[in-house]
Amino acid sequence: MKKVLSLIFLSLFTLFLVACGGKKEEATKNEGETKKEARVIKVTTKFVDDEQTAKSLVKVVEAINKRSNGSLELQLFTSGTLPIGKDGMEQVANGSDWILVDGVNFLGDYVPDYNAVTGPMLYQSFEEYLRMVKTPLVQDLNAQALEKGIKVLSLDWLFGFRNIEAKKAIKTPEDMKGLKLRVPTSQLYTFTIEAMGGNPVAMPYPDTYAALQQGVIDGLEGSILSFYGTKQYENVKEYSLTRHLLGVSAVCISKKCWDSLTDEERTIIQEEFDKGAEDNLTETEKLEDEYAQKLKDNGVTFHEVDAEAFNKAVAPVYDKFPKWTPGIYDKIMENLTQIREDIKNGK
């Protein structure tokens, strides 16, 4: 009897050990799955931490990382600390795990017609532009960008109309003569400032502050938010309201990276950048008046300009791009005319 009981006890003990071993193995497996490394995607931008676009991007990155439950780790690099502009777009097009938040003009290096859509003196309001980017015309450009390895997540990251910040007041194109003005490395900006009468000097935005101090340039062009956020008012005190271009950033991710993500990850990224664009616009609209007053408090003088004279001056810019699709300007104006009519009629 004792022998039988011993055998039963031994069998039960063996089963207990097997069960414990299985649970331990399952726990180890689950732990391994939990510790799966997150997909790291770098997000780079020229905007400094104090600028609204950078603040909105912080929210976007945090939301994506939280919603992905550890499968994604977006890392934000502001102030041009990692490649931006032309170099940043190359990272995207070449398939890096990379998101660039920078001017739409850098998309123009791959799909030239983007520069036509964001050309000088086109828009009178943010709403006109935001409706334009939803037209079939612009959606077709996004499809062309995809063929070049660039997935356009958003064209909606507005930061205000661009004006002239300089050491002298500007009223007419004649006042621009001889002025060395910083511009992004972009033919669109170069041709626009030349047409307006200035002398464009291409350089990365983070270098602008020192260039003003050292007299390398006499001023720059940019939005009220950028002018205040980067403290350029410490070097120049005249702000002339040319409104020659609309300040807007594109959000672009590598197609290779995008295609390798899960459907859920793609949805999270798209939704959060869309929300971020709305947040950025809302805050931008609120801050423009506030920052204008702060600039005045810091000794900056605002100047209205001869808009008609500048409109005439920049008209030839649209003939300087042989790579643009023939008739693209007419198509843009056709869409813009309809957009203005719809806005007027409350549609």
Where are these regions (language model features)?
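Positively charged n-region of N-terminal signal peptides that target proteins for export
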Residues: 1-4
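Sec-dependent N-terminal signal peptides
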Residues: 7-13
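C-terminal motif of bacterial Sec signal peptides marking the signal peptidase cleavage site
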Residues: 16-19
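N-terminal secretory/targeting leader peptides
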Residues: 21-127, 137, 145-347
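Short beta-strand-centered segments that line the small-molecule binding cleft or hinge
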Residues: 131
